[in-house]
Amino acid sequence: MSRVVLAYSGGLDTSVCIELLRERYGYDEVITVTADVGQPEEELREAEEKARKLADEHFTVDCVDEFVCEYCWRAVKANATYEGYPLSTALARPLIAQKVLEVARDVDADAVAHGCTGKGNDQFRFESYLRAHGGEEFEIVAPVRDLNLTRDEEIAYAEERGIPVPVDVDSPYSVDENLWGRSIEGGVLEDPSEEPPEEVFEWTVSPAEAPDEPEVVEIEFEDGVPVEVDGRDDPVEIVRYLNETAGEHGVGRIDIIEDRVIGLKSREVYEAPAAVTLLEAHRALEAFTLTRRELSLKASLEEEWARLVYDGLWFNPLREHLEAFFDSTQRHVEGTVRVKLFKGSATVISRESPRALYEEELISYEEKQFDQRTAEGAVKLHGLQERLALRRRG
């Protein structure tokens, strides 16, 4: 008996994949796996109910704590964004792929499958991990891509077979959610000249409709990661709280043109209130506690880390080398940052740290502890190479 394990979200793509794997690929059993990485409880419940009707067996794997502590907190240390996007979907994919492989081994499956299209990034993220960690054990199947299905064709296929799906031709948005962020694609969003309609947003209010009074949150960091926010010290609760609180003030909306792995440019809309707030606070604390050269080198390495994750290369050895450097710097990133949330902005208004490299007595114009006359020699030498180049090169 042939058996395939499908990474299952409950959305259109993965729902039609269940029947396609039987009908077009001939698998006798289709087993679905949903990884809980912080999706809304209602979404998880609906996915599980649907999977139990459509699939032969279903597993929901709780990995939200692991997602925050082992993935999101690494992203905070790396100040990770790709072209302005905090990598929410990209961060979750290797963890989901790992859980799919674990179930596939437990049930003695012949193959693993995903519902990614041939135009998106997730096919790279899932398959690179699956091939690296299970390519010799399992066949990898991608029905939507391999059958070259359009979204309208998937909707029609679902309607013909009575497969319940959360979209139709009048509301064709594709949404992916985890605790670190929410991504929205499709429909009118594919026209970059059109403003995203308010109906696509769920986590954030319109900045114009946000409260007229700002709210300040206090974030405490140790070793570069948040350990307490307004009295909350559980990692998952910290992210949930900031998603709710910052979202109420319109913080975290992102609308960008993004360069996909495959080479296409796409219009992407995201909501990431907690990620945006935490990254803003973390950068401010780093500027307070790290040297200029540490910050400069780290900025270039952060870009490389983010690109690895975005491209689906979580398992690349370079990521671990980069994180070794990040971890070394983060030993000094300790302190408290206060962030004001107001009508779409998250603004750092204060920072305190026992490891601060800021010395008020030295920088103050009212103090004489720093002898200004000692700067004369440095000023004379500053730009020496540039002056020589100007003379000798004309």
Curated annotation (Swiss-Prot):
One Gene Ontology term, aspect cellular component: cytoplasm
EC id: 6.3.4.5
Q: State whether keyword rRNA-binding applies.
A: no
Listed under catalytic activity are: L-citrulline + L-aspartate + ATP = 2-(N(omega)-L-arginino)succinate + AMP + diphosphate + H(+)
Q: Where in the cell is it found?
A: Cytoplasm
Print the keywords alphabetically: Amino-acid biosynthesis, Arginine biosynthesis, ATP-binding, Cytoplasm, Ligase, Nucleotide-binding
One MF term in GO for this entry?
Answer: argininosuccinate synthase activity
What is the enzyme's class at the highest EC level? ligase
Task: Say which domain of life the source belongs to.
Answer: Archaea
Chain segments annotated as transmembrane = none
Residues annotated as binding L-citrulline are: Y85, N121, R125, S174, S183, E258, Y270
Main location per UniProt?
A: cytoplasm
Q: Does the keyword Cell inner membrane apply?
A: no
- Subunit comment: Homotetramer.
Say which family it is in. Belongs to the argininosuccinate synthase family. Type 1 subfamily.
Task: Please identify the protein, giving its name as recorded.
Answer: Argininosuccinate synthase
- Where does this protein come from, organism-wise? Methanopyrus kandleri (strain AV19 / DSM 6324 / JCM 9639 / NBRC 100938)
Q: What gene, per UniProt, encodes this protein?
A: argG
